[in-house]
Amino acid sequence: MASEEGQVIACHTVETWNEQLQKANESKTLVVVDFTASWCGPCRFIAPFFADLAKKLPNVLFLKVDTDELKSVASDWAIQAMPTFMFLKEGKILDKVVGAKKDELQSTIAKHLA
């Protein structure tokens, strides 16, 4: 379900995932996807930081996918470790950050907004 600007949108169904990507492709919006898992300690550590980035950057679409909940999406995107952050624009992968690396996450977003 889509939420307000400046929030992380959790994709609980493949349909929601596809809808969000479609909208982002049409608007040429930068998308940052957090592939996460409920049991993943580093994922829980970085989640508040990811949410804070979403508040600070309302012109970027922040999505969250639980790899256990949407196994097919995680498989399609070849997710091997959590957290993995994918940076997408117009349906293309621009970049990827693996691990709870705050500085790298922030600098990669800045790079693709420049």
From Swiss-Prot:
Electron transport found in the keyword field: yes
UniProt xrefs under InterPro entries: Thioredoxin (IPR005746), Thioredoxin-like_sf (IPR036249), Thioredoxin_CS (IPR017937), Thioredoxin_domain (IPR013766), Thioredoxin_H-type-like (IPR050620)
Site positions (Contributes to redox potential value): 41-42
Disulfide bonding pattern of the chain: 40-43
Residues marked Deprotonates C-terminal active site Cys (site): 34
Modified residues annotated as N-acetylalanine in this record: 2
Record domain Thioredoxin: where: 2-114
One GO BP: positive regulation of catalytic activity
Subcellular location: Cytoplasm
Domain of life: Eukaryota
Cellular component terms per the entry's GO annotation: cytosol
Pfam families, alphabetized: Thioredoxin
Alphabetical UniProt keywords: Acetylation, Cytoplasm, Disulfide bond, Electron transport, Redox-active center, Transport
A GO molecular-function annotation: oxidoreductase activity, acting on a sulfur group of donors, disulfide as acceptor
Active site: 40, 43
Primary residence: cytoplasm
Keyword Transcription: no
Function recorded in the entry: Thiol-disulfide oxidoreductase involved in the redox regulation of a number of cytosolic enzymes. Activates the cytosolic malate dehydrogenase (MDH) probably by reducing an interchain disulfide bond of the inactive MDH homodimer. Possesses insulin disulfide bonds reducing activity.
Assembly notes: Interacts with FBA6. Interacts with MDH1.
Family statement: Belongs to the thioredoxin family. Plant H-type subfamily.
PANTHER family associated with the record: THIOREDOXIN (PTHR10438), THIOREDOXIN H1 (PTHR10438:SF425)
Protein name per its UniProtKB record: Thioredoxin H1
Classification of source organism: Eukaryota, Viridiplantae, Streptophyta, Embryophyta, Tracheophyta
Gene transcribed to yield this protein: TRX1
